[in-house]
A protein has these predicted regions:
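C-terminal single-pass membrane-anchor helix
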Residues: 176-191
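Cytosolic/nucleoplasmic/matrix-facing N-terminal domains/tails
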Residues: 1-178
């Protein structure tokens, strides 16, 4: 696995529920159907890899032609704990179909979340300082065609809301959709 695939996530503790943690900065990629590799063609490494804990979720949507598109969000936990993990990007998509928002999670750090057709945007779910996020918002707007109903701007860069405003609107069904699967990753080694 390439180094760029190792992306630690930003973890935010839910202020109202113990052991519920919201994960941001997942890497979102479209799901591509893979061909099966016969077992005698698989390469087995002789180096014992360090085990990391991964977070993963796959979501799908159907377009007007009936075609299903799937996205997978993945991230790496550097220090796993006994918590239940949920995707903040999926929570954002639960109430914003085509839009974006900038949210504050610390004194100097912001989150940029965006939704296209009710799914997380591949180039969103990112964090950084004010300048980084401004650049990411500009890139998102330049690379994505504006929908007919215009982009819904939930929280602007000039006046970012607190990230907790996202989770206050969730129903129990939305919460189930946001749940992340926790697993071990042993396919790569760390330096």
């Amino acid at each position: 696995m390439a180094d760029e695939d190792i992306n630690p996530v930003v973890l935010l503790a839910d202020p109202k529920v113990n052991h519920r943690v919201w994960a941001a900065c997942l890497k979102w990629t479209p799901v591509v159907k893979k061909q099966r590799v016969p077992s005698h063609h698989k390469h087995k490494s002789h180096v014992k890899p360090r085990r990391l804990t991964s977070l993963k979720v796959t979501v799908g949507s159907t377009n007007s032609r009936g075609k299903i598109s799937l996205l997978t969000g993945t991230g790496i936990l550097t220090r796993p704990e006994r918590n239940h993990y949920f995707s903040l990007a999926l929570a954002f998509c639960s109430w914003v179909r085509n839009g974006y928002g900038v949210f504050r999670y610390s004194d100097k750090e912001l989150l940029f979340l965006a939704s296209i057709n009710g799914q997380p945007a591949v180039m969103a779910d990112l964090s950084g300082n004010d300048a980084d996020v401004a650049q990411k918002v500009s890139l998102f707007l330049a690379m994505n065609e504006e929908p007919p109903e215009k982009w819904q701007v939930v929280s602007s860069l000039e006046h970012p809301d607190n990230w907790e405003s996202i989770i206050t609107r969730l129903s129990s069904a939305d919460l189930r959709r946001c749940k992340l699967t926790v697993g071990n990753r042993s396919k790569f080694t760390l330096p």
